[in-house]
């Protein structure tokens, strides 16, 4: 049996070819060491459902859920290094966005805005926003009621579509 492999965190349509190439390289390396590996990635599975599946071979998670609920159940084998601006070495970057016609010039202008976040256990998609807002909040509510979207792209779509600010 070759197991389940999923790289869903950043498997956006524009990156699909690169994600497949990454998996192909990983699968070839695994097979060269005698480990079975699926030909293709599982894209139609709920990421939360695969973490305790005995067939899980390889998957990608955000660091926050790894440290808070997955550590001890799965083994960390690598941390990707991306070449996006602000992501040099071990660093990563989160973007806080508003609609193109929004007058906000900075985060301090966003008091009362309704955020769209990936999930409450996402470092880049939730906790980074909390950390950025904390100094502005001064112990009082700063942002309005937000929504959880499940993915970075879905959060951007929620802002663009008006479901969030």
Question: What residue spans do the PLM features occupy?
Answer:
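Bilobed "Venus flytrap"/periplasmic-binding protein-like clamshell domains
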Residues: 5-25, 89-157
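N-terminal hydrophobic or amphipathic helices and topogenic motifs
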Residues: 1-73, 79-83, 87-91
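A generic structural signal for alpha->beta connector loops
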Residues: 35-36, 73-74, 112, 142-143
């Amino acid at each position: 049996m070759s197991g389940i492999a999923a790289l869903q965190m950043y498997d956006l349509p524009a990156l699909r070819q690169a994600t497949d190439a990454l998996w192909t390289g990983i699968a070839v390396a695994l097979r060269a060491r005698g480990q079975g590996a699926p030909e293709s990635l599982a894209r139609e599975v709920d990421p939360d459902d695969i973490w305790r599946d005995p067939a899980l071979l390889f998957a990608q998670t955000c660091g926050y859920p790894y440290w808070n609920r997955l550590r001890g159940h799965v083994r960390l084998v690598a941390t990707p290094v991306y070449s996006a601006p602000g992501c040099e070495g071990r660093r990563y970057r989160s973007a806080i966005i508003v609609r193109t016609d929004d007058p906000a010039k900075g985060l301090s202008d966003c008091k009362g805005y309704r955020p769209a976040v990936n999930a409450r256990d996402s470092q880049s998609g939730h906790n980074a926003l909390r950390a950025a807002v904390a100094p502005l909040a001064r112990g009082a509510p700063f942002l309005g009621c937000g929504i959880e979207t499940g993915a970075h792209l879905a959060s951007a779509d929620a802002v663009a579509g008006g479901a969030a600010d």
